């Protein structure tokens, strides 16, 4: 079914040694790639890094951003971070048009599997047909399994969903999942890129930002 934006995420900040080791292992994997191939690879310095920020839509301070935002031109192709299994594509008011993949070959020793989520797309280019969607529902999302190669575009950068007043970008979210437990992780560390603190972290009111 639909990816629920209300799912609770657990942030891996209690056992830094474990997560640092995991990041190092994953970024050495073959086939891991940045989702944008053309245009800027820069992250929105005010609101787009993984971590605490001021939420530009909800107008809340000290809000934890569980992904990264990559500004780019509307229509720029978005690719998967690695080959995986297509789980869902759809639309909701928060995510806009989005695509969800699982990566069963990337998992922890205790069974947490990596998932990647691509949000605010202007369009998605992968979806289930009616028969496939029916089979997914009656099989509790276990059949059919549709492989997605890393070379296949998932969609295009856009402004759909709850991003009013912000520029076109794609939001990338990476999570390790096991049953009902979902742990959000910093996508930048998977690509060996430097993560930073959002510049909006100290904003307390909308008037404090210019």
Where are these regions (language model features)?
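Surface-exposed, glycine-biased beta-strand/turn segments
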Residues: 1-98, 106-107, 149-150, 159, ...
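Intrinsically disordered, low-complexity coil segments
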Residues: 37-44, 56-61, 105-110, 129-145, ...
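Short amphipathic beta-strand/extended segments with alternating polar/hydrophobic composition
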Residues: 47-49, 110-111, 116-121, 183-192
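Short alpha-helical segments in extracytoplasmic peptidoglycan/chitin-binding modules
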Residues: 70, 118, 154
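Disulfide-stabilized cysteine-rich extracellular repeat microdomains
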Residues: 75, 123-126, 162
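Zn2+-dependent peptidoglycan hydrolase active-site motif and core
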Residues: 80-143, 167-171
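Conserved, short, structured surface segments that act as functional micro-motifs
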Residues: 97-103, 137-210
């Amino acid at each position: 079914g639909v990816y629920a934006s209300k799912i609770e995420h657990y942030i891996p900040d209690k056992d830094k040694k474990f997560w640092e080791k995991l990041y190092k292992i994953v970024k050495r994997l073959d086939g891991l790639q940045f989702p944008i191939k053309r245009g800027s690879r820069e992250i929105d310095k005010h609101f787009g890094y993984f971590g605490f920020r001021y939420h530009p839509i909800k107008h809340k301070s000290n809000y934890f951003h569980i992904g990264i935002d990559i500004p780019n031109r509307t229509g720029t192709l978005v690719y998967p971070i690695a080959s995986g299994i297509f789980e869902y594509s759809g639309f909701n008011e928060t995510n806009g048009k989005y695509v969800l993949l699982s990566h069963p070959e990337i998992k922890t020793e205790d069974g947490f599997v990596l998932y990647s989520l691509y949000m605010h797309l202007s369009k998605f280019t992968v979806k289930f047909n009616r028969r496939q969607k029916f089979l997914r529902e009656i099989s509790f999302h276990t059949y059919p399994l549709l492989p997605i190669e890393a070379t296949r575009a998932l969609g295009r950068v856009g402004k759909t969903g709850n991003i009013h007043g912000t520029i076109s970008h794609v939001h990338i979210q990476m999570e390790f999942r096991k049953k009902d437990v979902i742990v959000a992780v910093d996508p930048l560390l998977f690509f060996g890129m430097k993560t930073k603190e959002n510049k909006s972290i100290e904003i307390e009111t909308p008037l404090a930002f210019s």
